[in-house]
Swiss-Prot record:
Residues 589-623, 710-732 are annotated as: Actin-binding. Residues 110-160 form the Myosin N-terminal SH3-like domain. Residues 913-939 are annotated as: Disordered. GO terms for cellular component: myosin complex. The keyword ATP-binding applies. It comes from Arabidopsis thaliana (Mouse-ear cress). Residues 832-861, 855-884, 891-920 form the IQ domain. One of its GO terms (molecular function) is actin binding. Residues 918-933 have a biased composition (Basic residues). Residues 164-830 form the Myosin motor domain. The lineage of its organism: Eukaryota, Viridiplantae, Streptophyta, Embryophyta, Tracheophyta. This is Myosin-4.
Length: 1134
């Protein structure tokens, strides 16, 4: 394989002496954690608590991030020390006279500290104290008041009490198996089922309900109010990484059967649903799919009451805003054999028991459903119920889930019908008919019900189950089956129907959860696959399950051990390799070509005469050289898996791997009336015709399909960032509160928890390329003139943050950071970005204000221009209208002036006539006035001659005041009279309106009367044949009314004319009074007197006018009535 030029350059650089290295590349960090003091027993957490006060005093003089990094550095330093201790303990087996451990033992004796020692009687670890030591490697340990002598290899140091029940196992001062077991046991006893082992979450199944879930905890973890280990925290970390890095994430849940993987997966989905719930509305559907998949894919086994008999990968997609927009479900290798064969104490799939217990009476009657004990497929294991499980209630929840996932009611009933058909197939029996053990189907209730539920002919069904067709040239021969063959044919039909139904349900779920156009490339995949299994009798199904777990363990090792350590070594940083248990040898045993177990199984399955015994012999012949394989007598063989050694029996391996698909069964399904069965048959027929070559036929084997699915799954997981959850089963009896140390220890060893903690405490979980670090945290640099070289920029960033050198290492291509450093950098970045945002906010505010002021000033100027233009236009319009109005005003003024002159002339004329009449009286008044004038002149002379007395002056002043008051009163009266005049004008307008309406009415009456008169004239025209006397009479009788009518009309016209003239006079007279402006008291009195005269004249005319109007109305009405009577008489006489 050719190496790239970059790799060659890096390899050559590694070989160069440190003095010859390029200055542009960093030298590997020389930092190594110092060896711990032998007497050191307290953890970093405890030391930090002691020095808290001093740190608080010094905090003002330190950078805040430096303090956090220093505390993290102390923790990491302790971690590295513990690694050295553990390494020393591992080496003591080779050199039992290690002086360091002897000194440590003396320290433990002197301080009376505890150690762990395994008791041979029960194999349990117990706490004891070292009582004494010898010159050899033997120590005396006191256990429960009994002394026991042990070698140095048999004891391990115990952690102080302050570290009991720590959340993260990396916080333990002494890292060994008994310390891990004890810490998990303490937490398990307190219902703290979650613990951390570096990046891995350890979940111990409590086998009971614990109060650490629900809305309160969901909200707390969303708000980062809690940081305790929890499945919610893992899901939250996956979500944050997806949104921040825009990379797909995966949550891989593993563990043995019964460890709680399915429940853990459901809680992870629940948190993601709460975190990413949105307007798309699919989050509830995603949760409800668990109910459907558990019912159809889970069953009770001897080790787990709710064991998943299939693997599933739920890929949840998110929008750019982090909201769930859809999901996709993938399933792997459903255990079909469980439909027909069960071990004692186990159950078939949950759905069958739920259907029998929870179906409504109407549904049971329609589908012929009986109790579960009536079906052979269910009662063969003598286990029909599960403790603390209500199958009827589960069935009702299943119905709700069907509705939420939008499976139509019609298809729900068809699904239940096929389930009932599978149950009744188990009750189909056969009868032997000859000595060759050939059989035929017994025509009983079971056959009838199966044919009815499938929608096929019962006779056709019986033929298919008891015979098989063989092609002999062009002829097709029907061959009878033996009892074993017929039973297998029946069971094959049941398994085909159930497996096809399961796959169809998965397709319907995917249709309901389809992402569509909302796909953004951001997803979180949750893997829940069957756990490691080892029973008394292990067959093909257990081999497939354990093979899948081996592949998952390799993925786990690859990401947590191999890739990380290879990256450390390849990038040139200082690193001490951590050993771990690698299962690659076991995978080679299974997968290696051409002599791997899978290849040999496929090869043997293609030989028609091959048997399970020949297959077992071939395995022993080719695989004995592998350390993970061990042949047994007969058909048995052993494989040393990562989780333990398992004994397999090859009985049924070949037949189950071939999984022959009978053409007769496909044809039977295609003839059924059930639409689902027709759909299943079409797909199976397509798959049956698909293989065209030998290699294709090999790929059709069950193990080949399973291997292909497994590799596809691994490739998908490799493209994601993994988050691991290891589920631990505390006891094999599934009892709450029971903690079996040996059972837990075996699982911890299989998971490599000890090695995970070691590598987590001494490793660098966060790594970024120089370019990524420079781009992401370049904003932390205050000096913008720094070199643009990413390496130099990265170093400057780390120096700017005052990070201790032991908290990071600089590699050839990446920067490696210890735990906690990235959070400090993120906090510093947030702090700087908040300042930048504040500055941007202020600047944008200034820009906005300036823009607003400019816009306001421009608007004011524009408004002024517009108002000026409008004013000019209005001035032109007003000027033109003023010219017109001035001409009209002049004409009106001339008319008013003319009227004024006429009224003035009339008033003078009236005055002259009045003066002529009153001339004698006036002369007398003149004489009296002259005498009065002489008297007044005499008084004036007297007043001039005599001084006015004060009392007289006061009297005169009071009189003046009275006169002024009288003038004011007269002015008020004048105002009142003007108001009254205005009211009279209003009344006049009303009267005028009424008169007009009355005039119209009378005009109409007159028109109708004239028409009647004209008609009467036409009717009463002079008849020359009539007598002269009659004509004379008629003429006189008609003539009089006509004259009267003409008289009435003339009266009406006179009244109308008089009314018009009078209205003009009444309207003009007050105006003339108003127009004459005079402030003298005499003129005011004259105006008031003139107004009273106008008022009295108007009242008098109004009264006379009303009288004449009534008389005229009476005459007109009388003439109208006579005309009607005359008209009637004329018509009658005519």
């Amino acid at each position: 394989m050719m190496k790239s030029s970059v790799k060659e350059i890096l390899e050559s650089l590694r070989l160069l002496d440190s003095s010859e290295r390029s200055s542009s590349l960093p030298s590997p960090s020389t930092f190594r954690a110092p060896m711990p003091l032998i007497r050191q027993s307290l953890p970093a957490k405890f030391r930090n608590a002691i020095s808290l006060e001093s740190k608080t005093i010094e905090k003002e003089d330190k950078d805040w991030s430096t303090e956090q990094i220093t505390q993290s550095a102390e923790k990491e330093k302790t971690g590295n020390e513990v690694v050295k201790i553990s390494t020393a303990q591992m080496s003591r087996a080779k050199n039992s006279h290690d002086p360091e451990w002897i000194n440590s033992a003396e320290y433990f004796v002197r301080e009376k500290l505890c150690v762990w020692c395994r008791v041979a009687a029960n194999g349990q670890w117990h706490l004891g104290k070292i009582h004494s030591t010898s010159s050899s490697d033997d120590v005396c340990v006191m256990l429960s008041a009994n002394d026991d002598v042990r070698t140095m290899e048999e004891i391990f140091p115990a952690n102080p009490e302050i570290l009991e029940g720590v959340e993260d196992l990396t916080q333990l001062s002494y890292l060994n198996e008994p310390s891990l077991l004890y810490n998990l046991r303490v937490r398990y006893s307190q219902d703290l089922i979650y613990s951390k082992a570096g990046p891995v979450l350890i979940a111990v199944n409590p086998f009971k309900n614990v109060q650490i879930y629900g809305e309160e905890f969901l909200s707390a973890y969303q708000k980062n109010a809690l940081d305790a280990p929890h499945v919610y925290a893992v899901a939250d970390a996956a979500y944050d990484d997806m949104m921040r890095e825009e990379k797909n994430q995966s949550i891989i849940i593993s563990g043995e059967s019964g460890a709680g993987k399915t429940e853990t997966a459901k809680y992870a989905m629940q948190y993601l649903e709460a975190l990413g719930g949105g307007s798309f509305g699919v989050e509830n559907e995603i949760l409800k799919t668990n109910c459907i998949l558990e019912a159809f894919g889970n069953a009770k086994t001897s080790r787990n009451d709710n064991s998943s008999r299939f693997g599933k990968l739920m890929e949840i997609h998110f929008s750019a805003k982090g909201k769930i927009c859809g999901a996709k479900l993938e399933t792997f290798s459903l255990d079909q054999s469980r439909v027909a064969q069960l071990c004692n104490g186990e159950r078939c799939y949950h759905i069958f028991y739920q259907l029998c217990a929870g179906a409504s009476p109407i549904l049971k009657e329609r589908l012929k459903i009986k109790a579960a004990s009536e079906y052979n497929y269910l009662n063969q294991s003598n286990c029909l119920t599960i403790d603390r499980t209500d199958d009827a209630q589960k069935f009702h929840k299943l119905m709700e889930a069907f509705n939420i996932v939008q499976i139509p009611q019609e298809y729900q009933e068809r699904t239940f019908a096929l389930l009932a058909a599978v149950l009744w197939l188990g009750n189909v029996s056969f009868e032997v008919i000859d000595n060759e053990n050939h059989v035929e189907v017994v025509a009983d209730e079971a056959v009838t019900n199966v044919a009815m539920l499938m929608g096929c002919n019962s006779k056709k069904l019986m033929v298919v189950l008891s015979t098989c067709k063989l092609q002999a040239g062009r002829d097709c021969i029907a061959k009878r089956l033996t009892l074993r063959q017929a039973t297998d044919m029946r069971d094959s039909l049941a398994k085909i129907i159930y497996a096809s139904l399961f796959n169809w349900l998965v397709e319907q779920i995917n249709i309901s959860l389809e992402v569509g156009n909302s796909r953004t490339g951001r997803s979180i995949s949750i893997l829940d696959i069957y756990g490691f299994e080892s029973f008394k009798d292990n067959s093909f199904e257990q081999f497939c399950i354990n093979y899948a777990n081996e592949r998952l363990q390799q993925h786990f090792n690859r990401h947590l051990f191999k890739l990380e350590q290879e990256e450390y070594e390849g990038d040139g940083i200082d690193w001490t390799k951590v050993e771990f248990i690698d299962n690659q040898e076991c995978l080679n045993l299974i997968e290696k070509k051409p002599i791997g177990l899978v290849s040999l199984l496929n090869e043997e399955s293609n030989f028609p005469k091959a048997t399970d015994t020949t297959f077992a012999n071939k395995l022993k012949q080719h695989l004995n050289a592998n350390s993970c394989f061990k042949g047994e007598r007969g058909r048995g063989f052993r494989i040393k898996h990562y989780a333990g050694e398992v004994l397999y029996n090859t009985n049924g391996f070949l037949e189950k791997n071939r999984d022959p698909l009978h053409v007769d069964l496909i044809q039977l399904l295609s003839l059924c009336k059930c639409q689902l069965l027709n759909l299943f048959s079409t797909k199976m027929h397509h798959d049956f015709l698909k293989p065209a070559t030998f290699s294709d036929s090999m790929n059709q084997s069950v193990i080949a399909k399973f291997k292909g699915q497994l590799f596809k799954l691994m490739n998908k997981l490799e493209d994601t960032t993994p988050h691991f959850i290891r589920c631990i089963k505390p006891n094999s009896n599934q009892l709450p509160g029971l903690y079996e140390e040996n059972h837990v220890l075996q699982q911890l060893r299989c998971c490599g928890v000890l090695e995970i903690v070691r590598i987590s405490r001494s490793g660098y979980p966060t790594r970024l390329t120089h370019q990524e670090l420079a781009v992401r945290y370049g904003c932390l640099l205050l000096d913008t003139r720094i070199s643009q070289d990413p390496l130099s920029t990265s170093k400057a960033i780390l120096k700017q943050c005052n990070l201790p050198p032991e908290m990071y290492q600089v590699g050839y291509t990446k920067i490696y950071l210890r735990t906690g450093v990235i959070s400090v950098l993120e906090e510093r970045k947030k702090y700087v970005l908040r300042g930048i945002l504040g500055l941007q906010k202020q600047f944008r505010g200034y820009q906005t204000r300036e823009y607003f002021h400019n816009m306001r000033n421009a608007a004011v100027i524009l408004q002024s221009y517009i108002r000026g233009e409008n004013a000019r236009r209005n001035y032109i319009v007003v000027g033109e209208s003023a010219i017109v109005s001035t001409a009209i005003t002049k004409e009106l003024d001339a008319a008013i002036h003319l009227q004024y002159m006429v009224r003035k002339w009339l008033a003078r004329k009236l005055l002259n006539s009045t003066q002529q009449k009153n001339k004698p009286r006036n002369e007398k008044k003149k004489t009296r006035r002259k005498s009065t004038k002489r008297v007044s002149e005499d008084k004036e002379l007297l007043s001039e001659q005599f001084e006015v007395q004060p009392c007289v002056l006061a009297d005169l002043q009071s009189r003046v005041l009275k006169v002024e008051a009288a003038i004011m009163q007269k002015e008020d009266e004048n105002t009142a009279l003007q108001e009254e005049l205005q009211r009279f004008e209003e009344r006049w307008l009303e009267n005028e309106t009424r008169m007009k309406s009355m005039e119209d009415t009378w005009q109409k009456h007159m028109s109708s009367m004239q028409m009647s008169l004209a008609a009467a004239c036409k009717v009463l025209a002079p008849d020359k044949t009539a007598s002269h006397g009659t004509d004379s009479e008629d003429t006189m009788s008609f003539g009089t009314p006509t004259k009267e009518l003409k008289g009435s009309l003339s009266d009406v016209n006179n009244l109308s004319t008089e009314f018009d003239q009078r209205s003009v006079i009444i309207h003009e007279d007050p105006k003339s009074l108003v127009e004459v402006k005079s402030d003298s008291i005499s003129n005011r009195k004259q105006h008031a007197e003139e107004l009273r005269r106008l008022k009295s004249r108007f009242e008098k005319w109004k009264k006379d006018y009303k009288t004449r109007l009534r008389e005229t109305k009476a005459r007109v009405r009388l003439n109208g009535d006579e005309g009607r009577h005359r008209n009637w008489w004329c018509k009658k006489s005519y």
